[in-house]
A protein has these predicted regions:
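Eukaryotic intrinsically disordered, low-complexity regulatory linkers and tails enriched in Ser/Thr/Pro
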Residues: 1-154
């Protein structure tokens, strides 16, 4: 997909440092040498029957696996108004908790110890599926061309 043109939250450009692909996203910054990338993927899966995970992974010759993902409640894939209202109420509660803590909880990776705590995994959560598509497009373009790129997602 070439959605970066439609999404004003995304800036994707050639990187002055030609050896690297960089991503600045809410919640952090990731940088990898293009010659260290062994594979990239974009895929989706259902998690615990409640959430569809749209995910980009970057595997490297080092010890770290990078994951960029967007979470979509399964209710959004269905036409069920009642379920959607419950999900929206849950989101409001999470947002209010984050405001009290002074943190944007929506941008934070959600983990359950120890089931989702993986050594060597770097994770970033995105809030818009278009941002994930733009990120994958930038990554793929850099890896295929061997020319560094930098993407910034607001």
């Amino acid at each position: 997909n070439n959605n970066e043109d439609e999404n004003e939250n995304v800036s994707d450009s050639s990187n002055e440092n030609r050896r690297f692909w960089e991503a600045s996203v809410p919640g952090g910054h990731y940088m990898v040498a293009l010659d260290r990338i062994s594979n990239i993927s974009i895929h989706e899966y259902a998690l615990d029957g409640a959430v569809v995970v749209h995910e980009v992974t970057i595997d490297t010759n080092g010890r770290a696996l990078a994951r960029f993902y967007y979470l979509q409640p399964i209710s959004e894939t269905m036409n069920r108004n009642e379920v959607a209202r419950v999900v929206d109420k849950g989101r409001q509660l999470i947002d209010r908790a984050g405001q009290r803590l002074g943190t944007n909880v929506a941008d934070m990776v959600q983990k359950t110890y120890p089931a989702t705590t993986h050594a060597g995994t770097i994770e970033y959560r995105l809030q818009d599926i278009r941002d994930l598509d733009a990120l994958y497009g930038s990554l793929r373009k850099a890896w295929e061309s061997g020319k560094g790129r930098k993407i910034t997602i607001q």
